[in-house]
């Protein structure tokens, strides 16, 4: 345990927490323009073709973001909304595209968990 005089001369350092989503610049979401839309394969135990997009943000960052849900309408020059949230089996993908916002359509024929995929309530 440090003495009072030791703490006066050399105060305790606050640990600096590094942001997991630096491109958002402390905002909840950011707008961006797709520069490339493509598929990529996940890390070792998993196997799939994951849909991702390279996005140029208004904060001047270029990030890779994941397109969740089945099917999408994104192409180059689509304007999208980005939120934080990494994809564990895709290295370097630390952002998600928000479905149902700006140029991104919601997922068709989705019944459960609709709010996560920008789907309107079905006509009963």
UniProtKB/Swiss-Prot annotation:
Entry-annotated residues carrying 3-methylthioaspartic acid: 89
Coiled coil: none
Keywords: Methylation, Ribonucleoprotein, Ribosomal protein, RNA-binding, rRNA-binding, tRNA-binding
Start and end residues of each stretch annotated as Disordered: 102-124
Any matching Pfam family: Ribosom_S12_S23
UniProt GO BP: translation
GO CC entries: small ribosomal subunit
Annotated Basic residues bias: 109-124
GO-annotated molecular function: rRNA binding; structural constituent of ribosome; tRNA binding
InterPro entries on file: NA-bd_OB-fold (IPR012340), Ribosomal_uS12 (IPR006032), Ribosomal_uS12_bac (IPR005679)
Family: Belongs to the universal ribosomal protein uS12 family.
Quaternary data: Part of the 30S ribosomal subunit. Contacts proteins S8 and S17. May interact with IF1 in the 30S initiation complex.
Function: With S4 and S5 plays an important role in translational accuracy. Interacts with and stabilizes bases of the 16S rRNA that are involved in tRNA selection in the A site and with the mRNA backbone. Located at the interface of the 30S and 50S subunits, it traverses the body of the 30S subunit contacting proteins on the other side and probably holding the rRNA structure together. The combined cluster of proteins S8, S12 and S17 appears to hold together the shoulder and platform of the 30S subunit.
Classification via HAMAP family: Ribosomal_uS12_B
Name of the protein: Small ribosomal subunit protein uS12
Native organism: Francisella tularensis subsp. holarctica (strain LVS)
